[in-house]
Amino acid sequence: MTTQSPVYRIELELAREPGHPEGDRDHSYRLYLPLTDDGHIDASRYREIPDWCRVLRNRPGEEQAHGRILRGPGGRWLFDYSDASTSDDEVGFRLSEERFEPGEYVSIREDDGKTHAFRIVSVRPD
């Protein structure tokens, strides 16, 4: 009997960078993704449940953005906030290679074209 990987709730916060020496808890993401036992994105499970894979983005001074997590060309992972446009899409760099566990870091190119590092603060089954 095989068990299917559950969807996990992954919390990210802006890591330290110029202008944010302590990072920024208010600049954050919440990802909902299936993970393997070793903490990598389970791409085969994703293909079975793409509608469950969501993203919430919080930035100071903005409304919370709700979107979908999509698998793009070349295996890239994209955050899509509007079906009508690709100008709001964001790219997670090498997310397929990342291990999602607290204390690790991931990079996201946001809709303004700037890339930021985000610290993984929690990972738990949803």
Regions of interest found by a model, annotated:
Residues 29-33, 66-71, 118:
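Broad, structure-driven detector of short, well-ordered beta-strand segments within folded domains
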Residues 6-8, 72-75, 100-104:
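A short, compositionally biased
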Residues 38-42, 46, 53-60, 95-102, ...:
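Exposed regions on extracellular, virion, or secretory-pathway luminal proteins
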Residues 1, 68-69, 123:
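Short amphipathic beta-strand and strand-loop transition segments with alternating hydrophobic
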Residues 80-126:
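Short, compact, well-ordered microdomains
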Residues 50-91:
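Short beta-strand/loop turn elements enriched in aromatics
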Residues 1-46, 57:
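N-terminal intrinsically disordered, low-complexity, charge/repeat-rich segments that act as generic
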